Amino acid sequence: MKKLIALIVVAMLGAGAVFAQHNGQHCGNCPHHQQHAKQPAAVGLTFEQAVAKAFPAMKSTQKEGNWTAVCDANKKVLGYVVNSKPASDGIKGYNGETPVMIAFNAKKRITGVYLLANHETPGYLKRVQDTGFYDNWNGLTVKKALKKKVDTVSGATFTSRSVIMSVHAVLATL
């Protein structure tokens, strides 16, 4: 009788373990969970770093509605910048949001799109960068940039699609 009870207990424990694993209820320490728990460290520029990169002669900025004017030491407007956040909140690439800063010249034509801090995979980001993807909007007005169809980058589709959507999200607010 003791052997039968012991056998039933072992069978129940085994069945419980199988059922728990099948429903994703196990310890979380398995290689599967460890791989999914690893999120790349944030890469990309802060908004302030992106502004400084786009406008090396910048000495000050001044918020003007959705636009931020970038000025030199003599308070002359060098151009403008916009941050896709909060308009792009919720737009996700492969590993999360892909916020951008868009730089404009003094006549409000795009001079650059800069990816801000994000958690995308560095290899995908390099692939997007190497294609010249961020230059797609250069020279365009807001209106023309909103109409331009930009293709995603093969092999980095989620990342490039989310950048396109982030660009469009903020441009639509201007």
Where do the protein language model's features map onto the residues?
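Flexible, solvent-exposed loop/hinge segments and secondary-structure transition points
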Residues: 21-161, 165-174
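Positively charged n-region of N-terminal signal peptides that target proteins for export
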Residues: 1-4
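Bacterial N-terminal signal peptides
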Residues: 7-16
